[in-house]
Design a protein with these regions (language model features):
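Acidic (Asp/Glu-rich) sequence patches and key acidic residues
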Residues: 1-134
Length: 134
């Protein structure tokens, strides 16, 4: 069974269930000291808990940034640690690739939301500049 993590309307991460669970657990471990509720949400989204579904499409920019930061940190820990117990050596490279794909999707979503926020701020400033004109 595959897990499904909706990042945006256009970005959806769908790895094998064991990869989905493994990655969410690793991110939750890093995330827990900073945001225990969000870490619990990740853990509650594993395949054995709810069938492996998590929807991040409506999270705010700050939460998305925190997820990206902790995902990158968890990825770095996994990459430095190398092959560990419970992961077959032949699947390790695929796990890293899938994990990196999620990090890339989170980064893309963050950049898109930052650009949207900047455009809205520019539009807002332009509207108020018109109000101040003589």
């Amino acid at each position: 069974m595959a897990g499904t993590l909706e990042v945006t309307e256009d970005l959806c991460w769908m790895p094998a269930g064991w990869v989905f669970d493994n990655v969410l657990e690793r991110i939750a471990d890093v995330l827990y000291p900073q945001d225990s509720a969000l870490a619990e949400l990740l853990l509650a989204s594993r395949t054995d808990a709810n069938g492996g579904y998590l929807d991040l499409r409506d999270v705010n920019l700050e939460t998305l940034g925190l997820l990206l930061e902790t995902a990158n940190s968890a990825y770095g820990c996994l990459a430095r640690a190398g092959i560990q117990e419970g992961v077959s050596p032949e699947f390790y490279a695929g796990l890293l690739t899938q994990f990196q794909d999620l990090c890339d999707m989170l980064r893309t979503a963050q950049q898109a939301r930052m650009e949207k926020r900047e455009q809205q701020a520019e539009k807002h400033r332009g509207t108020h500049a018109d109000d101040a004109a003589p």
